[in-house]
Swiss-Prot record:
EC number(s) on file: 6.3.2.6
Source superkingdom: Bacteria
Database matches in InterPro entries: SAICAR_synt/ADE2_N (IPR028923), SAICAR_synt_PurC (IPR033934), SAICAR_synth (IPR001636), SAICAR_synthetase (IPR050089), SAICAR_synthetase_CS (IPR018236)
Gene this protein is translated from: purC
EC class: ligase
Family: Belongs to the SAICAR synthetase family.
HAMAP family: SAICAR_synth (MF_00137)
Pathway(s) this gene product operates in, as recorded in its UniProt entry: Purine metabolism; IMP biosynthesis via de novo pathway; 5-amino-1-(5-phospho-D-ribosyl)imidazole-4-carboxamide from 5-amino-1-(5-phospho-D-ribosyl)imidazole-4-carboxylate: step 1/2
Protein name: Phosphoribosylaminoimidazole-succinocarboxamide synthase
Provenance organism: Campylobacter jejuni subsp. doylei (strain ATCC BAA-1458 / RM4099 / 269.97)
The UniProt record lists the keyword Ligase: yes
Length: 236
């Protein structure tokens, strides 16, 4: 497979065309961003760690019936992925209240929610990725119909039901995470983007130490060490 020109660069990855019009190469970057890229940094080796973590998680999900865009991992930082039309919604799944949720609703930080909360944000940096509801999704034509909203929520909850016990077994609490979904040329809804400490909140099961991008957001230090610890636990 030939890697051709880059046609998209996001906060954490670059996408390159290939000699197959249905396949892309996704390259993980060392860049760190927070607060809609108002805060920026760089952590050497982060791209390698996120690529390895996301590869392991996507393989786990595929084994459990979740369709993903991943075809294969071809280097320490590169994956071959199916070309998708990305649904312009960030899907957030919350098991424990923290972050923006406690600011918006006044819930005590660390409160375990009675069930997994699924929220949507509009993917629009200029607007600050605002929270939206089902009706917004329909009015803005972000989804095809109400049935697709249900499909998205069901997939999000199924992913959470697979990952929560998996990480618990690794002595990690999956506090919350965000996913992006895409539609393939066959109109199949698939998990795209990545699942990594960039997109998840992981707390140590016993100490509640943060092992994710909050270490960068909150200037806690040792970002790379936290990502390395997550990978080590996943592989053990």
């Amino acid at each position: 497979m030939t890697k051709k020109e880059m046609f998209y660069e996001g906060k954490g990855k670059k996408l390159f065309k290939t000699d197959d019009e249905n396949l892309l190469i996704s390259e993980f970057k060392d860049d760190l961003t927070a607060f809609n890229a108002e805060k920026r940094g760089n952590e050497s080796g982060k791209g390698v760690l996120n690529c390895k973590i996301s590869t392991e998680i996507f393989h786990l999900l595929e084994k459990n019936g979740i369709k993903t865009h991943l075809v294969e991992t071809i280097s320490d930082t590169e994956q071959v992925v199916k070309k998708c039309k990305i649904v312009p919604i960030e899907v957030i799944i919350r098991n424990v209240a923290t972050g923006s949720l406690i600011k918006r609703l006044g819930i005590k930080d660390g409160t375990v929610l009675p069930f997994a909360l699924v929220e949507f944000c509009l993917k629009d940096d200029a607007l600050g990725d605002p929270f939206i509801n089902d009706e917004h999704c329909l009015i803005l034509n972000l989804v095809q119909n109400e049935a697709q909203i249900s499909e998205i929520k069901n997939m999000a909850r199924k992913i959470n039901s697979i990952l929560t016990p998996f990480f618990d077994n690794k002595n990690l609490r999956l506090i919350d995470f965000k996913i992006e979904l895409g539609l393939t040329k066959d109109n199949d809804l698939v998990l795209a983007d990545e699942i990594s400490p960039d997109s998840c909140r992981f707390w140590d099961k016993f100490s509640n130490e943060k092992l994710d991008k909050d270490r960068f957001r909150q200037d806690l230090g040792n970002v790379k060490m936290a990502y390395e610890e997550v990978l080590k636990r996943i592989l053990n």
